[in-house]
From Swiss-Prot:
Organism ancestry: Bacteria, Pseudomonadati, Pseudomonadota, Gammaproteobacteria, Pseudomonadales
Membership in a protein family: Belongs to the class-II pyridoxal-phosphate-dependent aminotransferase family. BioF subfamily.
In-chain residues carrying the UniProt-annotated modification N6-(pyridoxal phosphate)lysine: 235
Protein name: 8-amino-7-oxononanoate synthase
Residues bound to pyridoxal 5'-phosphate: 105-106, 175, 203, 232
HAMAP family listed in its UniProt record: BioF_aminotrans_2 (MF_01693)
Catalytic reaction annotation: 6-carboxyhexanoyl-[ACP] + L-alanine + H(+) = (8S)-8-amino-7-oxononanoate + holo-[ACP] + CO2
SUPFAM superfamilies, per database record: PLP-dependent transferases
EC number: 2.3.1.47
Pathway: Cofactor biosynthesis; biotin biosynthesis
Length: 394
């Protein structure tokens, strides 16, 4: 029998042990974590809609009409008209023929990928894709080939060497780096080599593109270019759940084949009603997005002036690259001492030697909030200097 306690201790010794913070109250920039009020820069609530009044009122109004629980799977008696309205709304929002509502983004990726590929097929996956994509690839039992991050030329070479059914899967916005996939080039090579392109736009929906419709539409691509679009509703949209959007045939096929859709209880229908209201806020949220963009630019300019290493990202995800696990944890603790919550991200979430602080900005933040973060980063800069001083001479 494996010694689980020993494995946990090894994680602690490597600076990889993870703990949960106990949050009280609503998700908003200033929240209560473990009983302490902190200004948070680690939420994915990019537009500040998680506690939006109209969305909560829509939920309250729907509850007496539809009840609380989903009660059954969608293919038994759990597919409520509220779910159906949301799917129609998501199809229109993404400019696609149909959409299918999943309980979580993880379930959407696992269910879609394992339904669209199997033994004898080949999946091509960006090396920095999300864990749910990786697990979907494993579950499919297809052959999996990983291409270097964003390297379309390398992908095209792989595609040219491969026959049979081919699936190319990529994040639209990469969750730990904040950069955007080269979607136009990916669509081109997939068409040229008869490969089905799947884009998980979990971190693009709500933030990028016309009226927040995501990275695919921002790139000027349509359903024909990107046949399979996956998105989540718990980030930019501010509620919960996920979806896949595409052709009528695709959605019908997934209803028949996606096990994570078939064999689970439907999400609460009242939540679907609240999500429809939130999509209205997303579509009318150009001022929110403009404010968010201004905050991103303000943070980047200030952090770079302080000498911090940032990644090339124009999205709300702004990683501060550290490298060493312990140094990342120390900087996170130093910021918390200043009343800020900024999480250290370590392997296996990111590659070895690439630990970082993942700063995420929200339209609910103010300029004063960002300035407070920058002041704390300036005060905590000595943490990095001390780490460099501890490094052994070569």
């Amino acid at each position: 029998m494996r010694d689980f306690a020993k494995e946990i201790e090894q994680r602690k010794q490597a600076g990889l042990y993870r703990t949960r913070r106990l949050i009280a109250g609503p998700q908003q920039p200033t929240l209560t974590a473990d009983g302490r009020s902190l200004l948070s820069f680690c939420s994915n609530d990019y537009l500040g809609l998680a506690s939006h009044g109209e969305n909560m009122r829509a939920l309250e109004q729907a509850l007496p009409e539809v009840g609380l629980g989903g009660a059954a799977s969608h293919l038994v008696c759990g597919h409520h008209e509220a779910h159906h309205r949301l799917e129609q709304r998501l199809a229109a929002f993404t400019r696609r023929s149909s959409a299918l509502f999943f309980s979580t983004g993880y379930m959407a990726n696992m269910g879609v990928i394992s339904a669209l590929a199997g033994r004898g097929d080949t999946i091509f996956s960006d090396r920095l894709n999300h864990a749910s994509i990786i697990d979907g690839c494993i579950l499919s039992r297809a052959r999996v080939r990983r291409y270097a991050h964003g390297d379309v030329a390398a992908l095209e070479t792989m595609l040219s060497e491969t026959s049979g059914h081919k699936l190319v899967v990529t994040d639209g916005v990469f969750s730990m780096d904040g950069d955007i996939a080269p979607l136009t080039e990916l669509a081109r090579v997939c068409k040229a080599h008869d490969a089905l392109l799947v884009v998980d736009d979990a971190h693009g929906v709500g933030v990028l593109g016309p009226q927040g419709r995501g990275s695919v539409l921002e790139a000027g691509l349509c359903q024909e270019d990107v046949p399979v679009l996956i998105g989540t509703l718990g980030k930019g949209v501010g509620t919960s759940g996920a979806f896949v959007a595409g052709s009528d045939v695709l959605i019908d096929y997934l209803v028949q084949k996606a096990r994570t859709y078939i064999y689970t209880t439907a999400m609460p229908p009242a939540l679907a009603a609240a999500t429809c209201a939130s999509l209205d806020a997303v579509e009318s949220g150009d001022e929110r997005r403009a404010h968010l963009d201004a905050l991103i630019q303000r943070f980047r300019a200030g952090a770079q002036d302080l000498g911090y290493e940032l990644m090339s990202s124009r999205t709300p995800i702004q990683p501060i690259m550290i490298g060493d696990n312990w140094t990342a944890l120390a900087l996170s603790r130093a910021l918390e001492d200043e009343g800020l919550l900024v999480t250290a991200i370590r392997p296996p979430t990111v590659p070895e030697g690439e630990a970082r602080l993942r700063v995420t900005l929200s339209a609910a933040h103010t300029e004063a909030d960002v300035d407070r973060l920058l002041r704390a980063l300036a005060k905590s800069r000595s943490v990095l200097s001390e780490a460099v001083a501890r490094e052994p001479a070569l």
